[in-house]
Every structure is written in structure tokens, then in C-alpha cells.
Amino acid sequence: MGHKVNPIGMRLQVNRTWDSRWYADTKDYGDLLLEDIKIRDYIKKGWWEHVAKRDKRPAGDAGISKIIIERPHKKCRVTIHSARPGVIIGKKGADIEGLRKKLAEITDSELHLNIVEIRKPELDARLVAESIAQQLERRVSFRRAMKRAVQNAMRMGSLGIRVNVAGRLGGAEIARTEWYREGRVPLHTLRADIDYAHAEAETAYGIIGIKTWIFKGEIMEHDPSAHDRRQQELQESGGASRPRRDR
């Protein structure tokens, strides 16, 4: 079963938690959920595409990994995790102020906007998948892009990584799937800290799907917030700790 389901969804309330962290009554739930979708879509598409077009940057240049939305009493706290926070903030904070004003128009609550830097993008499944997608759109060989991503992740301290690409690879008439793995990726082990993401590359031959799994170690405690704390520790330290082997 571990190979069939989403690894993050399978570990919710074990060592992972949701990106939307709030509670609402039945009558307000639908409105708040739609508000979350609008906020995420605007940050990833509307606002960033405008900034990228203005500054002539690639669409995924901001390196946004995830957007966490929390709703304390009559407030809305939006936290953007990005590998390039300076690109989002802009010169003298001009871009982030414009983003804050636009998001305040979407939500009726008092808005707080935070930017968190991802210091090791090579260990973030979302950024790795989007990086491979951008390379495929630039006509880089899919094998070279896959191997480069795997080597960078292992060099930065990952205990295992797997990358899948599927579609008309290399312009072939018949679509196929190829994958590359190094190290361990124990999908059946619930205590395993596995990051997963999916991205799409729009090429001249059609869409190519990319999936990445990154194994960062094991979390022994039963705590939904354990993954977030571990992420912060890995960013501050030198990467994932490798298990000892007795010889």
C-alpha cells in the first residue's frame, strides 16, 4: 500500500501535519477553504507570474516550496517557504508589500505574511521536481537532469532519493516511464521522514510528469509537528544524520 498512496497523506497525524492549520464551524468551512485556494493560487500563479514577466524571470524562479495558512482568532497568518526569499521580498521590500495588500483583499481577516528561507533546496522534493521540470522544458536530457538531482540530494545529506519521469521522453512516439534511485526510500515505514512532490514539464512533445521521493531519516516520536521541527534542524545543521553500522 505504501507504494500506491501519497506518502505525505499517509503520514498525516503520525509525523506530518496539514498545510492549512485552522478549525471552522460547518457554515464557515467552505468559505475559508475557498479562501485558502485563492491565496495559494494567487501567490503561485497570479502574483508571481506578474513579477516574473516584469523582471523577465523564469516562472519557477522564486523557489516556493509550500504555503502554510494558519487562522488564529480573526487573523490569517500566511507563511511562504522559499529557497529565494530575496526574490519574493523585492527591492526594499516593495514586492512583498504589494503582495500583502493583494492578499488582504482576498481575506476579510487581519493578515500576517511571513517568509521562511529554505537553505537546502536540494533536500526539498517540491523544489527538486520543479527544477527537473524547468530543465526538461529547456531541452536538457532527462537522464542528465535526474542524475544531477539525485547526486545533489545525496551530497547534501539525503539518506535516499527516487525520481520518476513519465511521458514522451526524448520526443519518443510511445510514452514510457523511467526512474532513478539511490539510497533507501522505505515507503512502507510510517516513521520514515519522506518528502514527496509532483511537477509537470510542458514540452513540445507534450506534458512530462515528474515525481520525487526524498528520505531524510526516521522520526521515532509520534508527533504531527515532528517533521517541521526536523526540517528546521536539518536546515541549521549539515543535513540528515546517517545511521551507524557496526562492522
Curated annotation (Swiss-Prot):
Q: Output compositional bias ranges, type Basic and acidic residues.
A: 224-233
Cite the InterPro entries for this sequence. KH_dom, KH_dom-like_a/b, KH_dom_type_2, KH_sf_prok-type, Ribosomal_S3_C_sf, Ribosomal_uS3_bac-typ, Ribosomal_uS3_C, Ribosomal_uS3_CS
Q: Which Pfam families match?
A: KH_2, Ribosomal_S3_C
Which keywords annotate this record? Ribonucleoprotein, Ribosomal protein, RNA-binding, rRNA-binding
Does this UniProt record's set of keywords contain NADP? no
Residue intervals of the KH type-2 domain: 51-119
Example of a GO MF term: structural constituent of ribosome
Q: Which GO terms describe its cellular component?
A: cytosolic small ribosomal subunit
| Region (Disordered), start-end ranges | 224-247
Q: Is the Metal-binding keyword given for this protein?
A: no
Which Gene Ontology BP terms does the record give?
A: translation
The record's PANTHER family line, in alphabetical order, gives: 30S/40S RIBOSOMAL PROTEIN S3 (PTHR11760), SMALL RIBOSOMAL SUBUNIT PROTEIN US3C (PTHR11760:SF19)
Q: How does it assemble?
A: Part of the 30S ribosomal subunit. Forms a tight complex with proteins S10 and S14.
Q: Which HAMAP family match?
A: Ribosomal_uS3_B
Q: Which family does it belong to?
A: Belongs to the universal ribosomal protein uS3 family.
Biological role = Binds the lower part of the 30S subunit head. Binds mRNA in the 70S ribosome, positioning it for translation.
What protein name does the entry list?
Small ribosomal subunit protein uS3
Annotated source species: Jannaschia sp. (strain CCS1)
